[in-house]
Amino acid sequence: MVADKSLMNAQSDYYRYGHSFTPLGYEQFTTLGAPVTLNPPEGARFALIQAVNSNVRWRDDGTSPTATTGMRIIVDEQMTYRGHLHVIELVEETTGGEINVAYYG
């Protein structure tokens, strides 16, 4: 359900701002035992972040998330992140977590 909401939010932005978003890139993190930061391409305005195999925690306030602290992305769901793409950190809750990230401008 969250995946659909993220897509609806992006579509809503399309109509609100009168333009489409350009896909700018994709990356996958398969090791999340320690917090990771994103590597957005130049011009990226937001990212769709999907948790795979495990719930994922994130923070963007300068403090690294842990397996028990931070905002949660439920496994197999995604969120739209419109904050500072270079600042957000993500970590798995349990071993085997991965994330898929799509960037848009």
Predicted region positions:
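Residue-level marker for the onset of beta-strands and adjacent loop->beta junctions
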Residues: 34, 45, 75-77
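Surface-exposed ligand/attachment interfaces on beta-rich extracellular proteins
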Residues: 21-42
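Short, charged recognition helix plus adjacent turn
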Residues: 28-31, 67-73
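Short, intrinsically disordered N-terminal pre-domain segments
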Residues: 1-22, 103-105
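Short, surface-exposed beta-strand/strand-loop-strand elements in extracellular ectodomains
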Residues: 50-68, 101-102
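Short, Lys/Arg-rich amphipathic alpha-helical interaction segments
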Residues: 88, 100-105
